[in-house]
Amino acid sequence: EGTPLEQEVTAADFIPEAPCGTFRDLKGGDAFDLGGTTIEIYDCPGHTLGSVVMLIPEERSVLLGDACNYFTFMFDDYSTTITEYEESLKRLSGELAGKFDTVYLSHGDGNGHKEIMEDVIAVCEDIKAGNTDDIPFSFMGKRALVAKAVTPQMGRRDGGRGNIVYSKDRI
């Protein structure tokens, strides 16, 4: 008895593992029905080459995940260049125009603002123009730059929303 957090969790509580061969890659244009709720997949290469975004039309919600958020990592070998990322975001923003009111992210409290894509596109443009603060950043042995200076709470000092961690050799 007790609350779910107080109960013993066993292997039977989990979904059984499936052999890897039964999974298939998600790609832009895919859609699936979860019993009255549709998930539409949109490509958004940037953070990773295979990044995707999910639109839930019935809820007018979009799950951007790591593809576009308040502190997007764009500095590793598995990321696109900033220029390619900006192109992805512009295309995605056009494809999703008027289709969502709610944005979900994969970090922080999970809530994003409706204009996050446009705000991150502006950061891409600032990076390309050299209009950045370039704060040194290290993560898992990799060195990069934070485009816009941040507060201790990781919000932008200039009051803007959206930021990119990038490498000058991947613009």
Can you annotate each of these PLM segments?
Residues 1-33, 70, 125-129:
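Active-site HxH/HxHxD metal-binding segment of metal-dependent hydrolases
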Residues 14, 23, 32, 71-75, ...:
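Phenylalanine-focused residue identity feature
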Residues 16, 25-27, 34, 61, ...:
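Intrinsically disordered, low-complexity regions enriched in small/polar residues
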Residues 26, 30, 50, 163-171:
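Short flexible/disordered coil segments
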Residues 38-126:
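Metallo-beta-lactamase
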Residues 90-171:
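Accessory terminal helices/loops
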